[in-house]
A protein has these predicted regions:
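Short acidic active-site motifs
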Residues: 26-27, 51, 106-110, 140, ...
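Conserved, mostly hydrophobic/aromatic
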Residues: 17, 40, 111, 119, ...
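Alpha-helix-loop-beta-strand connector modules within alpha/beta enzyme cores
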Residues: 53-71, 90-105, 134-157
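Alpha/beta enzyme core
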Residues: 29-35, 108-121
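N-terminal positively charged helical leader segments and presequences
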Residues: 1-84, 88-95
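Glycine-rich phosphate-binding active-site loops on the catalytic face of alpha/beta enzymes
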Residues: 84-94, 118-132, 155-178
Length: 178
């Protein structure tokens, strides 16, 4: 079940696009198709700092023009992201929307203690970004999601069709949204 939002929490998007080296060329087109209120998690770990900052500025401009939030992963606070993304230890103390990664019930608990607004629980299904990783599968994913005190975003091998079958707050993808 999707967790209800409280007034204390930042609005958690229902659709989240994660950036990486593989989908970079298609990001502007993907942003143009996302509904207002969605989010882009900017990662781009593969770029040198100066190039990474320039790419962040360009994508932030494109996203904001469409009413899409921009969440930063391991970026300096001065870049102007709308929030932070990463493991519980990486989001603790961050500002704005806090999206934590989780792969287990213990990590969901750590995310809650770190002040996360939501968890991206993964990998739900097999994924190209982590070949060979053991997927949770729909049943185990839903068991973990039901025990989560936070809104859950499904990540890992996600498509619109798969997302429609999972009764959680939302879904995220790297390849499934480009």
């Amino acid at each position: 079940m999707a967790k209800r939002q409280t007034n204390k929490r930042a609005a958690v998007p229902r659709i989240i696009l994660l950036s990486d080296a593989r989908n970079d060329a298609a990001l502007e087109r993907a942003l143009a198709r996302l509904p207002r209120g969605s989010a882009l998690v900017f990662r781009h770990y593969h770029l040198p700092e100066a190039e990474r900052h320039m790419r962040f500025i360009a994508l932030k401009r494109a996203a904001r023009a469409r009413g899409i939030g921009v969440i930063g992963a391991r970026i300096p606070p001065g870049w102007g992201a709308d929030g932070v993304y990463g493991a519980a230890t990486e989001i603790a103390g961050g500002t704005g929307l806090k999206l934590a990664t989780a792969h287990s019930l213990a990590e969901i608990g750590a995310a809650r203690r770190a002040g996360a607004d939501a968890v991206l629980l993964s990998p739900v299904f097999a994924t190209r970004s982590h070949p060979g990783a053991t997927a949770l599968g729909a049943v185990r994913f839903l068991l973990l999601a039901r025990r989560s005190p936070l809104p859950v975003i499904a990540l890992g091998g996600m498509t619109l069709r798969r997302a429609a079958r999972l009764p959680v707050h939302g879904w995220a993808a790297i390849d499934g949204l480009v």
